[in-house]
Amino acid sequence: MKVAVFFNPDGVRDEIKQKLFDTLHSLDFKYYLADFNNADDTIEKCDIVLALGGDGTIMHAAKRAALHNKKILGINCGHLGYNAGLEANELNLLYMLKIGEYKVDYRMMLKITIGDKNYYCVNDAVVCKGALSRMIEINATFGGAKMHYRADGLIFSTPTGSTAYSLSAGGPAIEPTLDCISVTPICAHSLFSPPLVVRPDTEIVVEIDSDSRGDAYLTLDGETAIELDTKTPIKITKADVYAHIVRIKEDGFLKILKEKIK
């Protein structure tokens, strides 16, 4: 088995990395180090990606792996590690990859289209105000049904991302292997702005209202920020690719939710 090892160089202790390399060597896995910012060539030639780090690193790697139709196993070296399949002290369980004793969850992703550019998200796409701006005015269309929001922002989340920023803003925790899109307002200035869950085939179009004052941005999985204007609509749909998340342990959704988010 060929393995792409993916980690943030500044985020993982040397002794953990060395233990991983020793474990892979003992299992006769051929492994390659993937560049954090340019991993595509390495991922393409491997069978599976091992992402060593916290949730941000794991989700960043999951997105890259999904675009190459590759599986990913997250190994938690961070604080929460909600989407990790193993903890850093469980590297001895990697032998289960060799004998095929694991399952793969297929996680829905989002495709974001702005003009002629496409972007992909594993967790969420967030339309939000700038740091010093007042609340923004957002027009959103859900398969033809129109909604208007006055808020600090809107979170469009996959089920995988529902337990991240969306949950903190009052959105629902959704079983991560479902296909749907959750929509959670951030500090809405309205008595009727409930979180929504819509069908995965719903085409969502978002525009910043011309009456909106101040800057507005779109952030993708918390790592890419795009400044928005009032002229260019944002189209949000279910992506045509899935993140392939490897699970070695038999922990279910509710057990992980209870243990990780206290």
What is the meaning of each model-derived region?
Residues 1-48, 52, 60, 64-67, ...:
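ATP/NTP phosphate-donor binding region
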Residues 54-57, 78-80, 160-163:
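Short glycine-rich anion-binding loops that position phosphate/pyrophosphate groups of nucleotides
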